[in-house]
Curated annotation (Swiss-Prot):
EC code(s) of this entry: 2.7.4.6
Biological-process GO terms, alphabetical: CTP biosynthetic process; GTP biosynthetic process; UTP biosynthetic process
Similarity remark: Belongs to the NDK family.
Protein's name in the database: Nucleoside diphosphate kinase
Organism annotation: Methanoculleus marisnigri (strain ATCC 35101 / DSM 1498 / JR1)
Reaction it catalyzes: a 2'-deoxyribonucleoside 5'-diphosphate + ATP = a 2'-deoxyribonucleoside 5'-triphosphate + ADP; a ribonucleoside 5'-diphosphate + ATP = a ribonucleoside 5'-triphosphate + ADP
Keyword annotations of the record: ATP-binding, Cytoplasm, Kinase, Magnesium, Metal-binding, Nucleotide metabolism, Nucleotide-binding, Phosphoprotein, Transferase
UniProt KW Kinase keyword: yes
Source species, domain of life: Archaea
UniProt xrefs under Pfam families: NDK
UniProt cross-references to InterPro entries, sorted A to Z: NDK-like_dom, NDK-like_dom_sf, Nucleoside_diP_kinase, Nucleoside_diP_kinase_AS
Amino acid sequence: MDRTFVMVKPDGVQRGLVGEIVSRFEAKGLKLVGAKLELLPEGRVVEQYREHLEKPFFPGLKAYIMSGPCFLMAWEGKGVVAVVRRMVGATNPAEAAPGSIRGNFALDIGRNVIHASDSPESAARELGIHFAAGELVDYSRIDEPVLYE
């Protein structure tokens, strides 16, 4: 089964959206295999967003991510990276579909509530940044036989 990394950013945590976001993914049939609430240190923020290091918005992004706790999650499911990205919505909330997480809860591209890996390769890299090997749990959901062929 595939895995992906999802992070509720400080604005989402501070607005009390963690439960709503977890509920949406669970209702879809995805399996939560790791979760923790953390104040991210600078080194991990830089590693997480390394593709943006030279962009003019990076200092603000780094300060924002470090401004409060983030809720880090590992999710598992068939095609989970694409499923989660669709549920999260476009990076720019103005372009996010109504009903998506960003479409419903975000107003500003700089405070867009949530991060989700954009490819299986990014998911593996980001999970490795934020979770140690023993922190992810293998188990079966009782409804898996109903969800998957």
